[in-house]
Amino acid sequence: MLYYKNKEGSMEYLESFRFAAYDQEYAFRLDEKRTCFDSMYPFFTLSGRGLEELTTGALTILYGGNGSGKSTALNIMAEKLSLQRESPYNRSPFYEGYLKLCSYDLLEKVPACSRIITSDDVFDYMLHVRALNEGIDIRREEVFRDYLTDKYGQFRFTSMEDLDKLKRVNKARSRTLSKYTRERIAHNVREYSNGESGFRYFTDKIGEDGLYLLDEPENSLSPSRQMELSRFLLDSVRYCGCQIILATHSPYLLAMEGDRKSVV
């Protein structure tokens, strides 16, 4: 079962979103000529759970068990609304056909900064920082070796072809190892714990005046970080002109204030 609850706030862009109704999906299936697929995902995923329309508020929370359709609903909305996303989404051959059957009502134009943020985005970010720093560390060792070779090795200038080498030697001999290294490579990107990195990712990506869809943002966050994230999201809604729609299992995020609650 998929549920949702809303919190009224100061700024809303999306008023409601209509997913494909069962009769529309059934008509599409009757007209579909391709028979080589085992699944027509996302067809019948949401209508089979009774979700054909979602009325949104300034803060809308989707919750339910695994497989209830939370992530599917958010991804369909993000694609239909042309929101920014980082990690690629695995679309099925029937995705475009499904999107054509969806519609929505806006209260305000959706800002260009609006985006969907998924668990994959956060994990990819942490892996990227780690890989970047590993690359910098390897490059630093190479620079150390170059410095020692240029500073203390034997060198004779014999032709203009040696000019670049002469410049490197002079630079090494006129600088300390630390200064020589800083000039040639970037600084490491600061790494935090997984929980702090995840929390910082959300605070970096969620700005002012935007529509943000969050898919299980509690992943990788400790209970204390989940509570901190809930306060940040509420402040973003109340004071920063944000509309937020999120799917979650977290009791800390589910505990955020909601003015109405519906079972669908």
Annotate each language-model stretch with its function.
Residues N66, I116, G135-E228:
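Conserved ABC ATPase signature
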Residues A247-H249:
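H-loop/switch region of ABC-family ATPase nucleotide-binding domains
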